[in-house]
Amino acid sequence: MRIIAGRWRGVPLAGVGKGDPGAHLRPTPDRVREALFSMLTSRGAIEGAHVLDLFAGTGALGFEALSRGADSVVFVENGRVGQRLITDNIAKLDASDQTRLLRCDATRCGPWSGAPFDLVFMDPPYGKGLGERALAAVRDWLAPGALVVWEENASMIPPEGFAPVDQRKFGTSHITLIARV
């Protein structure tokens, strides 16, 4: 797994190959990340953004956003393997001044006192309803109009307080783009 574009283009990230079912890690494939970031770039959603990466895993989506011009990323990951990989990648990219790792369950992180987030990546374990619960938990962390990129194994219906923006299917992955209203 590598950074696709931007200042860290081509830099390999610490990862788990095609995944680690025991650690519930399922990295988003390069071709899906390329298509996703093309969608976000065309909307002007990355440059200068404050990014929240929920169920961050390796942090690949957040690091890709930083590489392409986001101002900061907060990674939320409760698994030890994912936390170690994110910490390793922060060190590898010398990105500690632009990143923060919250070691908590994305559905129960409590209040946030920092800047509101403009862009959210959310790739929960498929089919467990965790995406809906995480959005409810962090809704007040988000700026009005914030974009949420939700990866699941089916198209998702936006919960109350969010509006649909776009949906795409890549193999077994469905990307649902919604905005906070």
Language-model segments: which ranges?
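Class I S-adenosyl-L-methionine-dependent methyltransferase catalytic core
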Residues: M1-V181
